[in-house]
Design a protein with these regions (language model features):
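Primarily the dimerization/phosphotransfer
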Residues: 36-76, 87
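Short alpha-helical segment of the dimerization/phosphotransfer core of two-component systems
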Residues: 94-99
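Helix-loop junction within the histidine kinase core
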Residues: 110-121
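Short helix N-cap motif at coil->helix boundaries in the Bergerat
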Residues: 126, 209-217
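Short helix-loop "hinge" at the ATP-lid/N-box region of the Bergerat-fold HATPase_c
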Residues: 177-178
């Protein structure tokens, strides 16, 4: 005599098996998507690094060729005037300083990615630091007839930071503004206190601007925006990622507001002496 179980038992078993298979299929699908995304990310990272190495090779060759060329001229020419010696040695010094800056940029990125870069925290006069940085870019701005405006809020408290690294951030932002602002353009620098122990330094230019995807690329180490305009300008693509990392190491932030064809505004936020009792990365407005 044959016996049969209840229909609801068979239905529950089928539903259970179906749910189990469906769950496995969903999991496998998610894993496949994750692997595909990881593969694409790895390929993009590899491509970016390859492009960076190719570009960096060109950047390194430029000052090296200048050093070798002017050194050869000093070595070959027997009857050379003191004025020429002074001129050539000046070119060699400039090229060597440029080469050192490139190498330091590579080392900084390596330290940042390895978590080995540290910053000091001491009271700093931000307007004085800004003035010294403006002197560095002044000649280039004048050469392009760029108007540079500054607006510093009175009574600004001292910031807490590493003098060398804060200057590195400011010089990068100012240098980029001059580089990407066309002749007879305008750059405006604003320094103002924020609430709860922070200060903001904003650099706004009337340059070519960036799309959201280009901003994302510019903030990525080894990422460079592939445009004809950028290819006409020297650069390693390390400046903004380093500046962002340094701002975060200080307990601050770096933000970019840019629109294609409408210029760029970069704001770096740094803690002031009022934030000594606050935790880094908190209460940032």
């Amino acid at each position: 005599m044959r016996t049969f179980g209840p229909k609801w038992f068979k239905q529950d078993s089928l539903i259970g098996e179906f749910s189990e298979h469906l769950g496995m299929a969903v999991t496998q699908h998610r894993q496949a998507i994750a692997l595909q995304v990881a593969k694409v990310d790895a390929e993009l990272a590899s491509k970016a690094k390859s492009e960076f190495i190719a570009n960096m090779s060109h950047e390194l060759r430029t000052p090296l060729n200048a050093i070798i060329g002017f050194s050869d001229m000093l070595h070959i020419q027997t009857a050379i005037s003191p004025e020429k010696v002074h001129q050539y040695s000046g070119y060699i010094k400039q090229a060597a300083e440029h080469l050192l800056a490139l190498i330091n940029g590579i080392l900084d990125v390596s330290k940042i990615q390895a978590g080995e870069l540290t910053v000091d925290r001491e009271p700093l006069d931000l307007p004085a630091l800004l003035s010294s940085c403006l002197l560095i870019i002044e000649a280039k701005a004048r050469e392009k007839s760029i108007a540079v405006e500054t607006a510093v809020s009175p009574g600004l408290p001292k910031i807490l930071g590493d003098s060398l690294r804060v200057k590195q951030v400011l010089i990068n932002l100012l240098g980029n503004a001059v580089k990407f602002t066309p002749e007879r353009g305008r750059i405006r620098i604003e320094v103002a206190p924020l609430q709860r122990g922070y200060a903001a330094i904003s650099v706004t230019d009337t340059g070519c601007g960036m799309s959201p995807s280009e901003v994302e690329t510019a903030m990525r180490p080894f990422g460079q925006i592939d445009t004809a305009f950028n290819k006409r300008h020297e650069g390693t693509g390390l400046g903004l990622p380093i500046a962002y990392a340094l701002a975060r190491l200080h307990g601050g932030d770096l933000r970019i507001d840019s629109h294609k064809g409408a210029g760029t505004r970069v704001t770096v936020i740094l803690p002031t002496i009022d934030s000594i009792d606050n935790q880094p990365d908190s209460h940032i407005h």
